């Protein structure tokens, strides 16, 4: 029969399989696969940030060093970084110099050390017979003039246990020839001017050098070299001296010892004065 022979169409399981698989979501990627796929993008962004920062750093460092950017348009990355490191080191030295200059004890310590070194040079020149008299006079005059510049500046007063002595160069000696104090050009980086023209120069190794200006010689009888003596030392047969002491140093083929040229008022000369010289260290 036609009605019996007709059958209802049934869905084939094979035909329905693609439809069910198309509706299922994709499997999520693992963390390692995600990092691997995003690594080129992150690397590109990182390089872009580095190049942008180096470009800005190049502009800043050239402006800070006051260099023409057109002449340094092809600076390598290593050159930019080296210039930046050097500039930052110089800035750090300048800041340290400013901090030391603000400290009033710095000049006092330097003055005491300079005074002691000057005394040692004077003793050597007084006992050495092979030094020319003119050279000896010029050197001592130069040192005394440099010390006079330091004395004219503001500094901490020495303790009460120390009293100033003076050794005056006689006016009969020839006028000393100016011998400017020199500092290594490599160390002359951003000098800091102190009071009275005194300069504190930072060195490349992190230390500091004191630059003394060339003094202007006046028509005074002679430059005065202040020394220090311990007031606790008393001369035999006389009371303790509390006033400054003056002496004269003469120059000849054989100069007398500097200790013998300094004599306290109303006291003895010679070894007692040599023992009374104050040493800061």
From Swiss-Prot:
Keyword list, A-Z: Developmental protein, Differentiation, DNA-binding, Myogenesis, Neurogenesis, Notch signaling pathway, Nucleus, Repressor, Transcription, Transcription regulation
GO CC annotation: nucleus
Region (Disordered): 1-44, 262-281
GO molecular function: protein heterodimerization activity; sequence-specific DNA binding
UniProt xrefs under InterPro entries: bHLH_dom, HES_HEY, HLH_DNA-bd_sf, Orange_dom
Residue ranges constituting the bHLH domain according to the UniProt record: 34-91
PROSITE patterns in alphabetical order: BHLH (PS50888), ORANGE (PS51054)
Residue spans of biased composition, Basic and acidic residues class: 26-35
Domain spans labelled Orange: 110-143
Bias type Low complexity, positions: 9-22
Free-text comment on this protein's domains from its UniProt entry: Has a particular type of basic domain (presence of a helix-interrupting proline) that binds to the N-box (CACNAG), rather than the canonical E-box (CANNTG).
Subunit structure: Transcription repression requires formation of a complex with a corepressor protein of the Groucho/TLE family. Interacts with the bHLH protein hes6; this interaction may inhibit the transcriptional repressor activity. Binds DNA in the form of a heterodimer with the bHLH protein hey1/hrt1. Interacts (via Orange domain) with id3 (via HLH domain).
Described function: Transcriptional repressor. Binds DNA on N-box motifs: 5'-CACNAG-3'. Promotes floor plate development and prechordal plate development. Required for lens development as early as the stage of lens field formation, partly through regulation of gene expression of the cell cycle inhibitor cdknx/p27(xic1). Required for formation of the neural crest downstream of multiple signaling pathways, and acts at the neural plate border via both DNA-binding dependent and independent mechanisms.
Protein name: Transcription factor HES-4
């Amino acid at each position: 029969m036609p009605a019996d022979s007709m059958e209802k169409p049934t869905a084939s399981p094979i035909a329905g399989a693609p439809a069910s698989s198309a509706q299922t979501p994709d499997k999520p990627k693992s963390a390692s696969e995600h990092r691997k796929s995003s690594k080129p993008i992150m690397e590109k962004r990182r390089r872009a940030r580095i190049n942008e920062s180096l470009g800005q750093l190049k502009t800043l460092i050239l402006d800070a060093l006051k260099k023409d950017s057109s002449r340094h348009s092809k600076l390598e990355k290593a050159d930019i970084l080296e210039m930046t490191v050097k500039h930052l080191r110089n800035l750090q030295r300048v800041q340290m110099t400013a901090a030391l200059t603000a400290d009033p004890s710095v000049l006092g310590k330097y003055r005491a050390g300079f005074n002691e070194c000057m005394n040692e040079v004077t003793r050597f020149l007084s006992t050495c017979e092979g030094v020319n008299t003119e050279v000896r006079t010029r050197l001592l005059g130069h040192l005394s003039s440099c010390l006079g510049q330091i004395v004219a500046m503001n500094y901490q007063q020495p303790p009460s246990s120390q009293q100033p002595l003076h050794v005056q160069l006689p006016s009969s000696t020839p006028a000393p020839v100016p011998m400017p104090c020199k500092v290594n050009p490599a160390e002359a980086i951003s000098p800091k001017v102190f009071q009275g023209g005194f300069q504190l120069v930072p060195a490349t190794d992190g230390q500091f050098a004191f630059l003394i200006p060339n003094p202007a010689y006046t028509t005074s009888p002679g430059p005065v070299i202040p020394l220090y003596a311990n007031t606790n030392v008393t001369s035999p047969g006389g009371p303790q001296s509390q006033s400054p002491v003056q002496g004269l140093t003469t120059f000849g083929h054989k100069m007398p010892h500097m200790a013998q040229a300094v004599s306290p008022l109303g006291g003895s000369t010679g070894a007692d004065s040599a023992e009374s010289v104050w040493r800061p260290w």
